[in-house]
Amino acid sequence: MERVKLPTLKGFNFKFDRDMIMPLSEEIEEFIIATPSLKRVKFTTQIPKDIQSNNIIEGIDDDIEAIRRIIGRKLIIDTNDNQDGKQKKVLNLYNAYRFILEKKDIDKETLRELYRLISDGLIDPRDQAKMGEYYRRDEVCISNLTYFDERITGVPYRIVDKYVDYLLEYIKTAKAENYTDSFIISQIVHFYLIFIHPYFDCNGRTSRTVAM
């Protein structure tokens, strides 16, 4: 098991099993090489497809051509309308992708702007009122599903800032020597931001975009 300099709430660091991943290394690298959207230089041409994949994860099955039309027309969106709400999510992701592609570094200000772009017009006003300058100022429930013994929550809001700083330092210092390393780093970043859950909503979209 390999330790990552990202602490749990109990104080010890998270670990992952590289030995389980390495047998898949060749398959991972072949997949990345064969997938244009995973290579940053070609990603701009693949944005509609990635937006579609991002939405499918959250149960929104948009047609790829519809996504292209939404992006191309820059529609005026009424977020109170259910259909327009879906279109707003498409435009927000498009703006967030374009923003993150121009950034070389992920820092606190970059993360705040990225979240602003992704969440624009989509946050419940009651939750928006409890947002701080960067992160939430109250607890958040991730799941109330009955098959869990207890409510699943994010990191306590008073230490969110500190835990996001741990993640930003990891992003800054993590070194990738090959495609497999890059894949592992991206998955760790995705997981840890979800673990923190620094916002009331749009955590998944933000974490997937940061992990790009």
Regions found by a protein language model. Give the residues of each.
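FIC/Doc superfamily catalytic core
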Residues: M1-M212
